[in-house]
């Protein structure tokens, strides 16, 4: 019965997305909701200008419909259900506002950094309050041990760092056709298996709803992309995967399951630090690091496949660590 629920959750999200995206693309084109390409980006990306964006509206809707339907059918509605709903829906809403400013007001950077950060912090605080009021453990596991450390009120700082950090990390990674879509299929599949193994069906249902939606979206987002997810999708996915890692108490494994997100973010931080420290020198040709490989002559598809492969290895190792 449990496996049936997971397969059904996956299938419904996948089908709704596959049907919805082709219907949504002409609507976005009619409204002229096309992606603007930043001037400092790689020149080979200029051809992507005008590609419909905000496609995440479809797959987030599909995910939420499937997730809520099968959560209620299976009787697995819990506090974790609503925490995951908060992460996906509210981070998605923040991303939608950012995308709307970009495409309607033609401001390629969307919300200011301060506005986006304050929004992320507000959502993270709400997540913590619901988490705390429902009596979830405010502890962190020490990797490769059975020891848990009670953080007390410091746990709220961890929540802020984790949710804000990973929502931004996925957002930074979303720069190549299909990259984040494919990595999300891999990462959420891994957490879905872990949640199922730990008998957390509420979380597992959520994970496989996302896998279904993302696999359906990938059909249209792979190179050459017919549609982009926008910040609507990347912020929602980043916030959600951070929330899942907390709910299954495998926070540190997210660093391995989401290793590409970590590497992409680290490349930006290193580049900025080195640039300022050396008065203008660079470590990489361009960051996030996927652009470094592009400018080194790699095709976009080669970069994506390589990064998917690294993400898959990290996910497999993580699942094995938990199960074996």
Curated annotation (Swiss-Prot):
Its EC number is 2.7.8.13. It comes from the Bacteria. GO terms for molecular function: metal ion binding; phospho-N-acetylmuramoyl-pentapeptide-transferase activity; UDP-N-acetylmuramoyl-L-alanyl-D-glutamyl-meso-2,6-diaminopimelyl-D-alanyl-D-alanine:undecaprenyl-phosphate transferase activity. GO terms for cellular component: plasma membrane. Its cofactor is Mg(2+). Pathway: Cell wall biogenesis; peptidoglycan biosynthesis. Disulfide bonds: none annotated. It is a multi-pass membrane protein. The chain crosses the membrane at residues 9-29, 53-73, 77-97, 117-137, 147-167, 176-196, 201-221, 227-247, 253-273, 304-324. One of its GO terms (biological process) is regulation of cell shape. Its main location: membrane. Keywords: Cell cycle, Cell division, Cell membrane, Cell shape, Cell wall biogenesis/degradation, Magnesium, Membrane, Metal-binding, Peptidoglycan synthesis, Transferase, Transmembrane, Transmembrane helix. It is an enzyme of class 2 (transferase). PANTHER family: PHOSPHO-N-ACETYLMURAMOYL-PENTAPEPTIDE-TRANSFERASE, PHOSPHO-N-ACETYLMURAMOYL-PENTAPEPTIDE-TRANSFERASE HOMOLOG. HAMAP family: MraY. Belongs to the glycosyltransferase 4 family. MraY subfamily. This is Phospho-N-acetylmuramoyl-pentapeptide-transferase.
